[in-house]
Amino acid sequence: MQTINPIWAEVQQSLQKTLSKPSFETWIRPAKFNCFENGLLTLIAPNTFSSDWLRKNYCQTIEKAAKEICGHDVKVVFKSETNISSDSINKENLDEQIVNHKTKLFHNNNQDISPKNRSKNPNGLNLRYVFKRFVVGPNSRLAHAAALAVAESPGREFNPLFICGGVGLGKTHLMQAIGHYRVEIDPEAKVKYVSTETFTNDVISGIRRDGMTAIRDKYRKVDLILIDDIQFLEGKEYTQEEFFHTFNALHESGSQIVIASDRPPNQLSGIQERLISRFSMGMTADIQPPDLETRTAILQKKAEQERMSLPRDLIQFIAGRFTSNIRELEGAFTRAVAFASITGLPMTVQSIAPMLDPNSVGVVVTPTQVIKKVSDFFKVSTDELISSSRRKPVSQARQIGMYLMRHGTDLSLPRIGDEFGGKDHTTVMYAIEQVEKKLSTDPNIASQVQKIRDLLQIDSRKNL
């Protein structure tokens, strides 16, 4: 199949001149040419979401541009890459497209929000959280596309937009990027970003001071509201009641609602069913931990922003060691730069590796090394460690092994489960969470983990 078509290339060039940069980069550029026969132009979108959005929002625009180039009417149809056979797409070209897409940062052609505009909109937005600073990867492409769609057309299809994902994966960044985008397009837009904790405190304050009218005006008379960490509504009955009516008032007035949580609506506990139902009535988009390629792109972009030159092998080393979230990844980058600056040591893997703690083993280790060291330390056999034994000494050793493997290798949760005798990824996740909790409350566990880390460091440095 021909994947580079001169007509589609010309159409893209034309659209690049007429559409905003974020719109073009997010929707038009990723679309791949499939075929052009008898006036029918077939395009392949990366996923069903993109295909549907293109069909609803850009079909006529593309058809008009194609008609101007071809000199006759052109009908455009869209297919989803996920719904067609893998052999119908040139995979090499598609992979290149995805790699390029990951490293592009999208935003308006204008500059960041100016202090003047911010003074007009006391919205609580962080200047750093804009689309152009967000690195898009397979883990976040859907959430990014949905966020941009809402920023471009608020109060329409995706209302509310519910963004969910673990800590430090970019939920707040995307939420606030929506707010910045709206303020740039319309400086008079009333945008409000607030954490659930702040909303709760405002409600409590309003009750105490008999000022609920002012609180309701504050939250209900906005064009766009961004509510972070909605899971903290759990158990707060009166606050839930107030938020329920606030949600209804905003939705009925056509205001856009964006909500972020560490889990999807159907997994929230201690929250009224009627609220969960409303959270689910729009679009839910999750963000997963970034893959190695995306983590590398994030570090490269951060190095560019900080005007730092880091060796490629060091960037890859950091990207390989910090796998759970972006916050940890960027924190490791900052510590590495600070360490090299203070000590005067060169920016190399050998010099930086030992200080990349506390959540990283700090050296290159293999799954076999982790299992061997944990087995030796706790004096349990390797076979018993990877078995299904629930004896407390074995179970505790296994949990620590899973924790160390998570933070000492770039293996995914399912892969770690495989290393421990085919355990389910949820079992691995639970084990890691248990160790993380105990590290701050149980000195004995903390000491055991640190001693095994030290043993792994000693072994690994022999190979540096």
From Swiss-Prot:
Indicate the principal place this protein occupies in or around the cell: cytoplasm
Q: Where in the cell is it found?
A: Cytoplasm
- Domain II: annotated segments: 79-123
The record's CDD domains line, in alphabetical order, gives: AAA, Bac_DnaA_C
Q: Name one GO molecular function term.
A: ATP hydrolysis activity
Cellular component GO terms held in the UniProt record: cytoplasm; plasma membrane
The record's section on SUPFAM superfamilies has: P-loop containing nucleoside triphosphate hydrolases, TrpR-like
Q: How does it assemble?
A: Oligomerizes as a right-handed, spiral filament on DNA at oriC.
- What is recorded about the domains? Domain I is involved in oligomerization and binding regulators, domain II is flexibile and of varying length in different bacteria, domain III forms the AAA+ region, while domain IV binds dsDNA.
Q: What does this protein do?
A: Plays an essential role in the initiation and regulation of chromosomal replication. ATP-DnaA binds to the origin of replication (oriC) to initiate formation of the DNA replication initiation complex once per cell cycle. Binds the DnaA box (a 9 base pair repeat at the origin) and separates the double-stranded (ds)DNA. Forms a right-handed helical filament on oriC DNA; dsDNA binds to the exterior of the filament while single-stranded (ss)DNA is stabiized in the filament's interior.
Q: Which family does it belong to?
A: Belongs to the DnaA family.
Instruction: State what protein this is by name.
Output: Chromosomal replication initiator protein DnaA
Organism in which the protein naturally occurs: Prochlorococcus marinus (strain MIT 9215)
